[in-house]
Amino acid sequence: MQENLIKVKDYIKNNWTRTIRKKDYKKDFTMPYDYISPCADGHLTELYYWDTYFTNKGVYIDNLENYALNNILDLQYALKKFGCVPNMCRKDGAEYSSQPPLLFLMVNDYYQKSKDVEFLKESYTLLEKEYNFWMTKRVSNNGLNHYCTNHD
């Protein structure tokens, strides 16, 4: 079992570079920073919201904090553009479902690693914007939050 875990970890570590997408990778929605997509090959080449939380956990383990920061800054860019962090970052991404709000955890994780107070201050307003989105656009009649599409 331990040997298999080591193989998986080595595979991931050796393939991070295959998942890096250049900021202009998708022509329909250009991200300001290079980012890590969930797949090296295949159709999942956009920046996906909650996948990025777990991706960032992995890049921290492998000491690639700069990619975690890029991912966060790209999600913050999408939040500014769409008013929410969409499921996937592409031109029509805000039409798709939102996902659980994990941006605050990503910001906290990065801050815990970097101790970058300016980053934290700059992120605060955007985190407040995401909070307000969830408290006004993603709250049910019973007061609980839920994720859905803008058409629900």
Indicate residue ranges for each PLM-predicted region:
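Acidic, mature catalytic/reactive cores of soluble proteins
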Residues: M1-D152
